[in-house]
Amino acid sequence: MDGLVGRKLGMTRIINEEGIMIAVTMIEILPHYVTQVKNKEKDGYCAVQVTTGNTRDKCLNKPKLGHLKKLGINYGKGLWEFRLNDSNRLISVGDIFTLKVLKCINKVDVTGISKGKGFAGAVKRWNFRTQDASHGNSLSHRAPGSIGQNQTPGKVFKGKKMAGHLGYEKATIQNLAVINIDIKNNLLLVKGAIPGVIGENVIVKRSVKIGYFKEMSSI
């Protein structure tokens, strides 16, 4: 398993050995308890289901509560799944995964729910250019312009970039450098910013593009 669930604690800065100041994000990753192992014969795919953190039983619905109580595992904040290869047959229910899973990884991808910014215009939401400041333009400086064609096709195509709700959607930041792993305090420090507000749950996985970049650099 090369992915873990963490909680965004916020940002800070550290000074490396060369004296360069680096902005980092602190992610708290508590121990993960395996609650179910799925296989291809029974479930159609291979995956491991985990829970982490602590919560009160009244915060869980009946199916999750019964599932965890049956296994005798502490009530976590939720259930998450991570895909496995067919070769990962040694994982069983009750196993514990910690930050040591990421110890030999230099780059990670972090997935979370981005900050919600409410209703936004096309300039802010899609980086449209503004219209002329003068030359006859009046009250349309930040308007998007035409959204269609003529009688043919006579409609607005789906996916047209227009004003609307900005943020609060799934976002992934790729190839973030791992600055430090503090196993004692369950902290992971990554370079740069990650999606979400402070306290948001995020998924930390091994970077999927780092191998590709290494291949390209050797050509």
Curated annotation (Swiss-Prot):
Coiled coil: none annotated. GO terms for biological process: translation. Methylated by PrmB. It comes from the Bacteria. Keywords: Methylation, Ribonucleoprotein, Ribosomal protein, RNA-binding, rRNA-binding. GO terms for cellular component: cytosolic large ribosomal subunit. GO terms for molecular function: rRNA binding; structural constituent of ribosome. InterPro entries: Ribosomal_uL3, Ribosomal_uL3_bac/org-type, Ribosomal_uL3_CS, Transl_B-barrel_sf. The modification N5-methylglutamine is found at residue 151. Transmembrane segments: none annotated. Part of the 50S ribosomal subunit. Forms a cluster with proteins L14 and L19. PANTHER family: 50S RIBOSOMAL PROTEIN L3 (PTHR11229), LARGE RIBOSOMAL SUBUNIT PROTEIN UL3C (PTHR11229:SF16). One of the primary rRNA binding proteins, it binds directly near the 3'-end of the 23S rRNA, where it nucleates assembly of the 50S subunit. Belongs to the universal ribosomal protein uL3 family. HAMAP family: Ribosomal_uL3_B. This is Large ribosomal subunit protein uL3. It comes from Blochmanniella floridana.
